[in-house]
Design a protein with these regions (language model features):
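Short beta-strand segments
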Residues: 15-17, 67-70, 243, 266-270, ...
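Short, glycine-/Ser/Thr-/acidic-enriched flexible segments
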Residues: 1, 20-21, 72, 188-190, ...
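Conserved anion/nucleotide-ligand pocket segment
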Residues: 87-95, 99, 106, 310-313, ...
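Short acidic, glycine/serine/threonine-rich loops at helix termini
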Residues: 5-7, 25-30, 78-81, 116, ...
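Flexible, low-complexity linker and terminal segments
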Residues: 165, 178, 315, 320-426
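Active-site cofactor/cluster-binding pocket
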Residues: 1-178, 182-184
Length: 426
């Protein structure tokens, strides 16, 4: 309430626990000093106490409707009516009370609330029943006693073919549909949720001969995550990692290694506010130019920015196809807003994602050269362990087989070979 009371417009409403009106700003330790100082100035200028009641008085004066209710009294009443003495002490029920009071205020049909509780506590029937009883009582309390609120939220018919999804899930599902089968990562906000989601769905049934399993490994740091991603790609496996700004900064040396060795990988960068640790749980789009110029020296890469969640599912497929076709690292730009937002959209259509592995070889003849000069600058790519497909990788400039060289003419030819694919990409 201290943080958000002034965001409610005239005609809006605030439902609050009447038992907390006397709580002071000093009692809320999550209020940082700069915010508290600004709040105190606001309260002092309006001659209000430094309490919940003080900020609520300001809200009321600008036309906000206040709806006080004692959450403790609701639990006590329910405890007596259901003859369940445990209920009066279950303050965790405050969440259900708050949601139910809100839905009762806007007159939203209660069926969806009851069905949601059933779904969440499907395996805990007793807990589900307690929550449903609490929800019903709280909803009816608000519907009967909260007055003068003009906003209502009538029920709507559920549309067929729709999907409720969070941003990181859209990208993760895009990776599954695109044939990504290996994702090492190091935990970082807000990127970790994608890998955790992939890990929780590691084993999927085979549909239309397209296996759906993705191996997810938590590494010791971002450098290792990038190295393992590259290693996975060298085996011919579609491989990706995900991170945020500080983690991506650590990955840039290995990004250059992938660039000089023409390794197709996808890095999903869930941007947040920097620099350094910056604001780790807040939205930002700070890394675009950094991603474009990431890594020492010049080498081709693709930076692909998604505009919204639904788009990101299909964009992920494009990222993998571009990586394989042009044999370059692809940096898929997302952000905290996309990662955390929840939307309803049309159900994704995985069949719209095609898989193009580019010049990935199934068989290799004698005399294979991994970095062979070709007309389009893109060389046929073998996998680790293929018969006759031996090649060398180093971080140095190399000849067509991968052996280190410092020959100036060969250096120019190799640079031209790599950079020429930018014309194909564009």
């Amino acid at each position: 309430i201290f943080r958000h009371y002034d965001e409610v417009i005239s005609g809006g409403g605030i439902i609050y626990d009447s038992d907390i009106e006397k709580i002071t700003t000093d009692a809320v330790h999550t209020l940082d000093a700069p915010f508290k100082e600004r709040l105190h100035k606001e309260l002092e200028s309006k001659n209000k106490p430094f309490t919940i009641a003080g900020v609520l008085e300001i809200a009321k004066e600008k036309g906000v409707l206040l709806y006080p209710v004692s959450f403790k009294s609701i639990l006590l009443t329910l405890s007596e009516e259901t003859e369940n003495p445990r209920l009066k002490g279950l303050i965790r029920m405050y969440n259900v009370i708050g949601v139910s009071l809100s839905l009762g205020l806007v007159k939203m049909p209660p069926d969806s609330l009851q069905k949601t509780i059933e779904s969440i506590f499907a395996k805990k029937l007793e807990i589900a029943k307690i929550n449903q009883v609490t929800a019903t009582y709280s909803y009816n309390y608000a519907a009967a006693k909260f007055e003068n609120f003009d906003c209502t939220l009538p029920g709507t018919q559920k549309e067929s073919g729709t999907l409720l999804i969070q941003g990181f899930q859209g990208t993760a599902l895009g990776k599954m549909a695109s044939g990504c089968r290996f994702q090492p990562y190091y935990p970082i906000t807000p990127a970790s949720d994608e890998s955790v989601y992939l890990e929780s769905n590691e084993i999927l049934e085979i549909i239309d001969d397209r296996p759906g399993s993705t191996a997810v490994i938590q590494t010791e740091d971002e450098i290792s995550a990038m190295g393992m991603t590259i290693g996975g790609a060298l085996t011919g496996t579609r491989s990706a990692t995900c991170t945020s700004g500080p983690g991506f900064a650590l990955m840039t040396e290995m990004l250059g290694w992938a660039g000089i060795n023409e390794v197709p990988i996808v890095i999903t960068n869930y941007q947040r506010s920097g620099p350094s640790t910056g604001l780790p749980t807040r939205h930002g789009q700070d890394d675009l130019l950094f991603s474009v110029y990431a890594g020492a020296g010049d080498f081709p890469k693709i930076v692909y920015a998604s505009g919204e969640i639904e788009e990101s599912f299909y964009d992920t497929g494009n990222c993998f196809n571009y990586a394989d076709t042009f044999q370059v690292p692809v940096i898929h730009m997302m952000d905290k807003f996309h990662a955390s937002s929840v939307i309803t959209c049309q159900r994704f259509e995985p069949q719209k994602i095609s898989i193009d592995r580019g010049k990935l070889l199934e068989n290799v003849e004698d005399g294979y050269r991994r970095f062979e000069f070709t007309e389009d600058g893109i060389s046929p790519r073998s996998r680790l362990g293929m018969n006759n497909g031996i090649f060398w990788n180093t971080g140095d400039e190399s000849d067509e087989q991968g052996h280190i060289t410092e020959d100036p003419e060969l250096r120019v030819k190799m640079m031209d070979k790599r950079m020429s694919r930018l014309d194909l990409i564009l």
